[in-house]
C-alpha cells in the first residue's frame, strides 16, 4: 500500500511487536465472537476494533481508530490518501460520507436478511439463505476495502466485518485476520476495490467457510 506521508508523520508499512500484534488480533476476534456480533454494525464498533488491534502498534497515535478525513484535527490523517497497487481508495474528502452511507446500507441489508432468517434462529438456514449470508459478508468486506477508510489495517477490519456477518448467523469466523488468506482472496479483494465486483469474494468465502468445517 502506498500513501502520501506528511513531515513528522511516520510511514506505516510495518508493525512493531509482531507477537503483541497477534495477541491483539486474537482478542478482537474473540470479542467479536463472544459479544460484538449481537451489536448493530456501526462506525464506532469498527473504530473500536481498529483501536484495540493497533494501539501501541501503529507508528503514530493519529492512525489508530480514526478514519482518513480532509478536516480532521489529527494532523497526520488530514488529506491522507491511500493507493493499493494502482487502485486509489476513496478520496479523503469523501471518506466520512461514504462510511456513513456504508453503515446505513449495511443495516438495511442486514434487516432484510434477518426478516427471513433471524440471527439466533434455532433452525438451520436453507441453501438460499446461506447464499444470501455469504453475499452480505462479501459485500461488507468488498465495500470496506473499496473505501479504505483507515490509514492502514483496512483488510483486517474488512475480514472482521465479513466474520461479523458469518458469526451473527451462526457460522464460525472463516476468514483469518492475519496472515491474509491465499491468492484467490487477494484477486477477489482487488476486484471489489477496483470494479465494485464482489462475486469473486463470494466464491472465496464459500470455499473458506466449507474448509473451516472440514
Please report, for each region that a protein language model flagged, where it lies by residue:
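FIC/Doc superfamily catalytic core
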Residues: 1-214
Amino acid at each position: 500500500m502506498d500513501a502520501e506521508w506528511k513531515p513528522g508523520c511516520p510511514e506505516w508499512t510495518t508493525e512493531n511487536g509482531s507477537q503483541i500484534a497477534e495477541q491483539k488480533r486474537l482478542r478482537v476476534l474473540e470479542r467479536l465472537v463472544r459479544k460484538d456480533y449481537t451489536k448493530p454494525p456501526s462506525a464506532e464498533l469498527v473504530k473500536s476494533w481498529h483501536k484495540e488491534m493497533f494501539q501501541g502498534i501503529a507508528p503514530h497515535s493519529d492512525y489508530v481508530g480514526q478514519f482518513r478525513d480532509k478536516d480532521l484535527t489529527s494532523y497526520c490523517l488530514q488529506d491522507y490518501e491511500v493507493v493499493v497497487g494502482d487502485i486509489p481508495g476513496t478520496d479523503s474528502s469523501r471518506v466520512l460520507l461514504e462510511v456513513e452511507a456504508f453503515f446505513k446500507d449495511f443495516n438495511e441489508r442486514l434487516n432484510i436478511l434477518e426478516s427471513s432468517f433471524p440471527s439466533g434462529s434455532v433452525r438451520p438456514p436453507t441453501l438460499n439463505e446461506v447464499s444470501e449470508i455469504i453475499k452480505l459478508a462479501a459485500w461488507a468486506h468488498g465495500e470496506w476495502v473499496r473505501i479504505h477508510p483507515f490509514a492502514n489495517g483496512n483488510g483486517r477490519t474488512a475480514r472482521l466485518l465479513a466474520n461479523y456477518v458469518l458469526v451473527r448467523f451462526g457460522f464460525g469466523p472463516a476468514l483469518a485476520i492475519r496472515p491474509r488468506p491465499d491468492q484467490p482472496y487477494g484477486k477477489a479483494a482487488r476486484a471489489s476495490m477496483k470494479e465494485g465486483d464482489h462475486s469473486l469474494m463470494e466464491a472465496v468465502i464459500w470455499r473458506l467457510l466449507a474448509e473451516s468445517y472440514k
